[in-house]
Amino acid sequence: MADATATNTSTTESSSSSQESYNLNDPLFLHLGENPGAVLTSQPLVGEENYSAWARSVRKSLIGKNKLGFIDGSITISSPLMNSPTAIQAWIHADNIVATWIINSVSPKLHGSIIYRDTAFEIWTELRDTFS
């Protein structure tokens, strides 16, 4: 019994220290809840008539997730933060998650214009240029 307690304590300490090694302020960090199915806004973009409210809601959600840089162009694959293969891979992963969130917050009838864009920034720019 004492051995099991010692093992559990050591496992918990190990897990805690590995979690502390993540920089939660790093825009490349993805929390477990930040998966492709996460919802950015309750109202999908349907067109010009709700673009302003939709865009504001999406921006606020992304600010809360520390991911606004993926749509405003400040966090790109060529930015100074991407200085290693690991960072580049993390950027690709995070950018694809953000792109998926945006696609999932848009009415399916509008998917044709954005589905083949490569980055979240390209998707955002296409929607902004089309509807704002």
What is the predicted function of each stretch?
Residues M1-S132:
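N-terminal Lys/Arg-enriched interaction segments
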